[in-house]
């Protein structure tokens, strides 16, 4: 199959539009129209992304509380926990075919993504470590951290491909210039109204701009992320 790769970048979009585009691209990879896609995006409106389901019910009370605080609410059919999206957080989705004949290995898929992101941070002179981050929102074993503080959260889904095989959706949320105390507020509010007692703390998170003197533009950071993916591809 001839490689058909695609790069899509949105510097200021809405969560709804980003996820609609992601779903469209997943279908194109599943049907072999594309070999792989890198989707990079940042929102223009503060939005709390909520996993759909009984654990996280969307109530009028929750919607009103978020709206009063200046946050939109978006519910989508995924696992995990609430994730805040604001300008100053870069998101990436890497959609690709898992190698044929190789059993899907979730640990390898996560570590591949973490390796690419490690290259991205190395380009900026920043050292990161991969581990869980207690008291962070949507905590996971494959967070990237600077000095024990979370800077990236990751997620993974595997989907079936037309004609057999598997497609991987690898996702990451990268804190660039977000106010960590403000972004945890809607998560705490959601936990409280949905009956969860998770202790979410702002100070266990850290944005990139606290660790570098330059302030690269979103376009520049998108380019460096793309470069990290290309560098990783050459070493495969």
Locate each region found by the language model.
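Short secondary-structure junctions
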Residues: 7-9, 73, 126-131, 234-236
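Short amphipathic alpha-helical segments
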Residues: 17, 21, 58, 105-116, ...
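Beta-rich nucleic-acid/ligand-interaction surfaces
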Residues: 130-151, 155-159
